[in-house]
């Protein structure tokens, strides 16, 4: 029988080993907070806002990078779905994504948009276990309201 501490270490070790075997994509709805944080210049934010630019950020492991710049929410959603599909197809050639991975979505503030996003993802990835939650405050304070995200996580073997 394992002690509580041993079980916690086992879980932690599994999560650490699999941290690079997942992907997160976040669509930022407004450039205001990226500008405040110094990630976008004032001129870049002004031009991007006029053009309706929605940046898509990518997190793999511990690294946050710009993934794409899209025009509008619809294009950003398509870009995120395509990126997740590509990653899943590359890692799980049998096509049974639900057997190998979980799908999650997240959002900041706009629950109505989040529910629509969830429905779109469930239609795009049938058979996958799915969860939706608000983005953590540590992320939300840097990207602002209206953000949508999608993530996939490798299932951990027991």
Question: Which stretches of residues belong to each language-model region?
Answer:
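Beta-strand segments within the central parallel beta-sheet cores of soluble alpha/beta enzyme folds
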Residues: 12-17, 102
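Short glycine- and Lys/Arg-enriched binding-loop motifs that mark or flank ligand-binding interfaces
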Residues: 3, 34, 44, 48, ...
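Helix N-cap and loop-to-helix transition residues
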Residues: 6-8, 41, 72, 110
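Gly/His-enriched, cation/cofactor- and phosphate-binding structural elements
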Residues: 59-158
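Active-site rim beta-loop-alpha module in soluble metabolic enzymes
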Residues: 15-77, 81
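Single conserved hydrophobic/aromatic residue that forms the stacking wall/gate
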Residues: 1-3, 7-11
């Amino acid at each position: 029988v394992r002690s509580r501490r041993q079980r916690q270490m086992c879980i932690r070790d599994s999560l650490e080993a699999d941290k690079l075997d997942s992907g997160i994509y976040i669509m930022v709805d407004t450039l205001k907070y990226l500008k405040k944080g110094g990630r976008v210049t004032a001129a870049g934010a002004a031009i991007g806002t006029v053009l309706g630019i929605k940046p898509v950020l990518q997190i793999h492991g511990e690294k946050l990078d710009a993934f794409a710049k899209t025009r509008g929410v619809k294009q950003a959603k398509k870009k995120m779905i395509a990126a997740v599909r590509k990653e899943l197809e590359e890692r799980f050639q049998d096509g049974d994504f639900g057997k190998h991975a979980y799908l999650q979505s997240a959002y900041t503030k706009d629950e109505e948009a989040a529910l629509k996003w969830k429905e779109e993802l469930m239609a795009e990835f049938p058979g996958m276990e799915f969860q939706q939650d608000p983005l953590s405050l540590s992320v939300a304070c840097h990207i602002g309201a209206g953000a949508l995200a999608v993530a996939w996580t490798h299932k951990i073997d027991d």
